[in-house]
Design a protein with these regions (language model features):
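Active-site neighborhood of glycoside hydrolase catalytic domains
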Residues: 1-21
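Glycan-processing catalytic domains of CAZymes
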Residues: 15, 21-70
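Intrinsically disordered, low-complexity regions
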Residues: 11, 24, 28-31, 134, ...
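Loop/helix patches that line or flank the sugar-binding groove of alpha-linked glycan CAZymes
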Residues: 4-9, 57-60, 72-78, 86-236
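Residues at the C-termini of beta-strands that transition into short coil/loop
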Residues: 17, 38, 79, 141
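The substrate-binding groove and active-site-proximal loops of carbohydrate-active enzymes
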Residues: 1, 44-53, 83-93
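Short loop/turn segments at secondary-structure transitions that flank enzyme active sites
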Residues: 19, 41-43, 84-85, 143-145
Length: 237
């Protein structure tokens, strides 16, 4: 092991087992953290169907599986990654759904990972080849000309427009990029949001199907509690 070989300091490893929770759980025997594919599968279904009331139950139900193999497991939560269709494509390029996905990722229990380009709303499907889900970042509004020449025929060229660049989104208070930044700051500001246990809400949960678009939970840590509420539907609640 790292420490047995003389390694010093903290060492953090994340494993990838691309399957449902019951198949992935045994791998916690050898690794402290695993990418959480079940998290994205459940969240994607909830967003595609506008139904949030089952989300917390779905997430909490898998935790005992992991605990069977490792008491200090770390869920490396994520949306899509480099081997899957992009989040933007899975959510129909809906800006609102992508914003909810980002907000849920950064307010749920786990150690979240953000796949590059996700914070800009990139889309792409594996059926067109790996390049379509691995588009490089367009940093400034003027950079699309160079990128267009090197990436032509490998990605959806509509992504290389000035409006989707980091520069443009950084200047737009309502952009997806700035939403990611806002929730990242909140997570870094409040330890309960970063490290707290996820607890089901007593009212807005899987038993309340009359308000099924709502997903709500508490994050709890050292006597502190924070309420998290998300609306997965189209109508205001």
């Amino acid at each position: 092991s790292y420490k047995a070989a003389g390694g010093e300091g903290d060492f953090y490893m994340v494993g990838e087992m691309l399957d449902e929770a019951d198949k992935a759980a045994p791998y916690y025997r050898g690794l402290p953290a695993l990418f959480e594919f079940t998290f994205w599968y459940k969240l994607k279904w909830a967003l595609q169907n506008g139904i949030g009331c089952y989300f917390v139950k779905d997430i909490l139900d898998v935790q005992p599986l992991y605990a069977q193999y490792r008491s200090d497991y770390i869920e490396a939560t994520k949306l899509s990654n480099h081997d899957e269709d992009r989040t933007g494509s899975d959510l129909g390029q809906s800006a609102e759904k992508m914003k909810v996905a980002a907000a849920v990722l950064l307010t749920a229990q786990g150690a979240p990972y953000i796949y590059q380009g996700e914070e800009l709303g990139y889309w792409g499907t594996k059926s067109n080849g790996d390049e379509y889900v691995r588009t490089p970042i367009l940093w400034d509004k003027a950079g699309n000309e160079l990128a267009s020449g090197s990436l032509s025929g490998k990605i959806d060229m509509q992504m290389l427009t000035p409006a989707i660049s980091v520069e443009a989104q950084a200047d737009d208070d309502g952009s997806l990029l700035n939403l990611y930044r806002t929730f990242a700051r909140l997570r870094n500001t409040y330890p309960v949001l970063a490290q707290g246990k996820m607890v089901k809400h007593p009212v807005y949960n899987d038993g309340n199907t009359s308000q099924q678009s709502i997903a709500a939970w508490y994050r709890e840590l050292d006597g502190e509690r924070m309420l998290v509420v998300h609306n997965f539907g189209r109508e205001e609640q």
